[in-house]
């Protein structure tokens, strides 16, 4: 029994990760990570969540829900910034927890993140499909139900657009990081300009009476809390999924130029931009129309613009937002493929996944992520996916918060002293852990249940395969493909 516990508690030598990941090309700069982060965080959710949360939970105080969620996300981002600067390894939280707590806990954290990437890829692709179909429907272009809805939903068999957009994104990423980064930078600029356009035009249509009362009176319906601080809290748990994309930056830190400076600037900079955009959109949206009018509205931004007489602006914003969803797919598929590569690198999943092609890209891992993303995105409905995204990620965030205490003890020894340091240590990591736990507790019962099932599957997989095939403390020798 002692041997078993010693095995699962084995910690990876950071020097070995440095050697294994040294074959990945370091090409990404601060501007690339800013684009990657903003593009991933500011995805489908900025055009949908403000209206949904306002109508279902918080009313005009949806802006407070976004602000409180941003505070929690910001605290996690501070821990991520120091971790990524000290340990710029592929796989982010998985690799960090592996080094600091041991293999089993690293696997649990990584398995939690893998759920995020699988579901987020499918979620964004499903949202892309819904928005694109809504955009072209007024001009008479409409797919048959069998090809436009997930299996078993409204007569659907497969969401073909969701499948195609995932395949196209995978094709782009398979060609190299430089091409993907250039595309990401252009699309993010377009997306931010579209959001700014909505805010400017929306300001001209604000009715101040829509903000009163700013925090509606609390009431409990059959399924949700609405109004009061209870409604704001319920909104925080739902909104938090909007901010989790900054992990995609850390997952690619092994490909960063000068990660000591690049990683903190990319993580904190992209989250700061996203917070400003989210709160601005939320405030303008609930000011344009009474929050109750956004109930069951899948495209509140476009609807509000059309109803206020700005149909042309609505078409422009929606068209750019649809194109801009590629940015979130790029970010999530990059991060997910690097996490699968990390599992293969360490033997916890088949080592086939860690193979690098002649461009030093883990395209085999990308292929697996693509196949699973296509299956989930084209077969499961948008609403089902939305509730599952943040649960696993929150578990990984709790691990990272606690790992700060282990990291500080090893900085200057077998780990470098990073250029960026988390402020208010040792208080802030504990506060971060408690706040993330509160956000997790506010998730719905189904999300927690599915998360538990996912972890049970992960533990079974680790005990049956990963534990026996682990390459812990094995120095990797890289053999270029022939």
Please report, for each region that a protein language model flagged, where it lies by residue.
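Membrane-interface loop-to-helix entry segments
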Residues: 129, 157-208, 267, 271, ...
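Hydrophobic alpha-helical segments and their helix-loop junctions in multi-pass secondary transporters
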Residues: 2, 130-138, 189-218, 283-289, ...
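C-terminal membrane-solvent junction of multi-pass transporters and transport-like membrane proteins
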Residues: 154-157, 352-363, 397-448, 468-481
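Hydrophobic, membrane-embedded alpha-helices of multi-pass small-molecule transporters
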Residues: 28-47, 159-169, 205, 221-276, ...
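TM-loop-TM module centered on a large, flexible mid-protein loop between adjacent transmembrane helices
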Residues: 95-96, 101-102, 133-141, 145, ...
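Transmembrane helix-loop boundary segments of multi-pass membrane transporters
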Residues: 54-58, 62, 126-130, 145-154, ...
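Membrane-interface "cap" regions at the ends of multi-pass membrane proteins
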Residues: 1-51, 55-60, 74-78, 90, ...
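Hydrophobic transmembrane alpha-helices that form the core helical bundles
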Residues: 54, 64-65, 74-166, 171, ...
């Amino acid at each position: 029994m002692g041997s078993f516990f010693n095995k699962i508690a084995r910690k990876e030598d950071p020097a070995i990760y440095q050697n294994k990941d040294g074959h990945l090309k370091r090409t990404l700069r601060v501007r690339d990570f800013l684009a990657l982060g903003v593009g991933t965080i500011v995805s489908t959710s900025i055009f949908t969540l403000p209206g949904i949360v306002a109508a279902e939970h918080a009313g005009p105080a949806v802006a407070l829900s976004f602000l409180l969620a941003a505070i929690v996300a910001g605290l996690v981002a501070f821990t991520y910034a120091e971790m990524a600067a000290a340990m710029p390894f592929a796989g982010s939280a998985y690799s960090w927890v592996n080094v600091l707590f041991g293999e089993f806990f690293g696997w649990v954290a990584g398995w939690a993140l893998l759920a995020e990437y699988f579901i987020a890829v499918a979620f964004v692709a499903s949202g892309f499909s819904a928005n694109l179909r809504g955009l072209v429907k007024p001009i008479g272009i409409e797919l048959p139900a069998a090809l436009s809805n997930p299996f078993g939903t409204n007569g659907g068999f497969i969401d073909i657009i969701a499948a195609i957009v995932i395949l196209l994104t995978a094709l782009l990423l398979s060609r190299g990081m430089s091409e993907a980064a250039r595309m990401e930078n252009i699309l993010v600029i377009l997306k931010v300009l579209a959001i700014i356009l909505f805010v400017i035009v929306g300001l001209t249509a604000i009715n101040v009476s829509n903000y009163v009362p700013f925090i509606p009176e609390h009431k409990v319906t059959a399924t949700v809390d609405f109004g009061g601080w209870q409604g704001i809290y319920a909104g925080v748990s739902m909104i938090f999924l909007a901010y989790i994309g900054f992990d995609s930056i850390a997952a690619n830190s092994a490909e960063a130029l000068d990660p000591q400076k690049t990683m903190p600037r990319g993580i904190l900079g992209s989250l700061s931009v996203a917070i400003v955009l989210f709160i601005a959109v939320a405030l303008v949206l609930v000011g344009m129309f009474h929050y109750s009018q956004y109930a069951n509205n899948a495209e509140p931004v476009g609807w509000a613009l059309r109803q206020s007489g700005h149909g042309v602006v609505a078409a422009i914003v929606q068209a750019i937002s649809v194109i801009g969803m590629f940015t979130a797919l790029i970010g999530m598929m990059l991060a997910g493929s690097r996490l699968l590569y990390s599992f293969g690198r360490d033997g916890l999943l088949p080592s086939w996944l860690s193979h690098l092609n002649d461009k030093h890209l883990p395209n085999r891992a990308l292929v697996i992520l693509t196949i699973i993303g296509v299956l989930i995105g084209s077969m499961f409905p948008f609403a089902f996916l939305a509730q599952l995204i943040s649960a696993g990620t929150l578990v990984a965030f709790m691990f990272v918060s606690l790992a700060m205490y282990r990291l500080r003890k090893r900085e200057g020894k077998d780990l470098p002293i990073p250029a960026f340091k988390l402020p208010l240590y040792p208080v802030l990591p504990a506060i971060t852990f408690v706040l993330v736990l509160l956000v997790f507790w506010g998730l719905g019962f189904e999300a927690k249940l599915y998360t538990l099932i996912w972890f049970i599957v992960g533990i079974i997989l680790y005990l049956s395969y990963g534990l026996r095939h682990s390459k812990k403390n094995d120095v990797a020798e890289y053999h270029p493909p022939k």
